[in-house]
Amino acid sequence: MVIIQEAPDGFRSLNDCTRIWRDGRVEQLGWPRVKIHYRSGTRIPTGATIEATDSSGAPLRFDVESKLPVPIHVGGGYGGDSDWIHGVWKGEKFAERLTYDMNDPAIIGRSAFGVIDHVGRAVCHDGGKSAEGWGLFEHGALGRHDPSGFTDWLTVAP
């Protein structure tokens, strides 16, 4: 499990990288180095490479792949979702279904302004062994983020 929160200059206010073994042991994996891979022209990750160390100092690498990005503030009510603002009461029997064309520039353009949850596939490379896992890969780079090369709210990946 990796949870990282960084300020615009990359300073980490939250840094947790742990491995949980089948027998319940929890191992801290040091200070992970993260490289997010973005789809060109967007802030939507296609995956990440995470380098960490086990408790003995030996290197570990995680290759994370996005299998399905879901901008949770496009129709999900999070953040500044213009269609369903989080917590807005629309009536006792209100029901609605909306369909979004994620290729529409007006829709996908909203992705840069909120968190994106991904169906994530990760492979942990530990020495000569590899192990595959699946889970949530959640990402958001809002505004300036120097480590990603984003100088302001509108900068996107090359």
Spans of features found by a protein language model:
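Structured soluble/peripheral alpha/beta segments that form catalytic or ligand/cofactor-binding pockets
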Residues: M1-P158
